[in-house]
């Protein structure tokens, strides 16, 4: 189409909706207990239970916020922010509206991100060449709290 995938999806709501459904389906494949979302939010994948109360989780490029929602449901003493492009963040805001402690904000992972204690990058870095992946990680590092 002569344009990047994200630009195309930002202008084509129907295709963006299909893409969101695909990503949700991939995350939830395997059922409620074996899905990537369930595993990613569990202590089997990361020592979530060892984090301090009120830790702030930043889901970078988090789409509609499915993983963040599960993390906050499993660990209600956390708060979290899903960061994605503006059109996606609007959908995430709607999805997360009933999840305590959750919010969605528009942003780019190449720029300043919200301050947080833990950063989640699910299915992000593999989409980019090494230079861009490094830029994403540098943006995360600049945004981290002192104890992150």
Predicted regions mapped to residue ranges:
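Conserved adenosyl
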Residues: 1-148
């Amino acid at each position: 189409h002569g344009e990047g995938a994200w630009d195309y999806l930002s202008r084509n709501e129907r295709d963006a909706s299909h893409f969101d459904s695909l990503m949700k389906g991939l995350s939830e494949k395997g059922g409620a207990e074996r899905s990537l979302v369930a595993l990613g939010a569990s202590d089997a994948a990361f020592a979530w239970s060892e984090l301090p109360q009120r830790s702030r989780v930043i889901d970078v490029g988090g789409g509609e916020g499915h993983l963040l929602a599960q993390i906050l449901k499993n660990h209600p003493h956390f708060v979290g922010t899903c960061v994605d492009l503006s059109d996606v963040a609007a959908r995430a805001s709607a999805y997360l509206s009933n999840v305590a402690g959750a919010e969605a904000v528009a942003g780019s992972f190449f720029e300043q991100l919200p301050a947080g204690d833990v950063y989640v990058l699910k299915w992000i870095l593999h989409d980019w060449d090494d230079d861009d992946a490094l830029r994403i990680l540098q943006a995360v590092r600049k945004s981290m709290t002192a104890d992150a």
